């Protein structure tokens, strides 16, 4: 199982939010271990690959498990690889249905660094505004 940890100080509304980023990967047999890393989290970002529908299904599953573990903490769904829209397997109707359920969704491209900062800014703002 791979875990990459980074720290980022984020400014939002004149306040500093110190984000500790846990990039959790791994196969399904490590799922329970990965979820244990979430304990105490104030929020999270889920990432789905626009060109692989299965990653959206997995993100939805992870969200349900995270909400069960953490309660209703802030989250953002980043739909990555927006630069590969021609190869999309995730349709606009699927994104619209999640948006209608209140999911904050941001289109991103790690390759072109589009939307990535916006995703972190949105999460930081949501954490600061959480009750």
What are these regions (language model features)?
Residues 1-131:
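TRAFAC-class small GTPase G-domain
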């Amino acid at each position: 199982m791979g875990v990459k940890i980074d720290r980022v100080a984020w400014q939002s509304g004149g306040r500093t939010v110190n984000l500790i980023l846990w990039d959790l990967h791994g196969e399904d047999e490590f799922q329970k271990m990965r979820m244990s890393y979430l304990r105490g989290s104030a929020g999270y970002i889920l990432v789905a690959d626009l060109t692989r529908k299965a990653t959206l299904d997995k993100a939805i599953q992870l969200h349900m498990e995270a909400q069960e573990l953490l309660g209703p903490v802030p989250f953002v769904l980043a739909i990555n690889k927006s630069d590969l829209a021609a190869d999309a397997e995730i349709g606009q109707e699927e994104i619209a249905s999640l948006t209608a359920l209140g999911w904050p969704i941001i289109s991103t491209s790690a390759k072109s660094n589009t939307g990535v900062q916006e995703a972190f800014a949105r999460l930081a703002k949501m954490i600061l505004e959480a009750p």
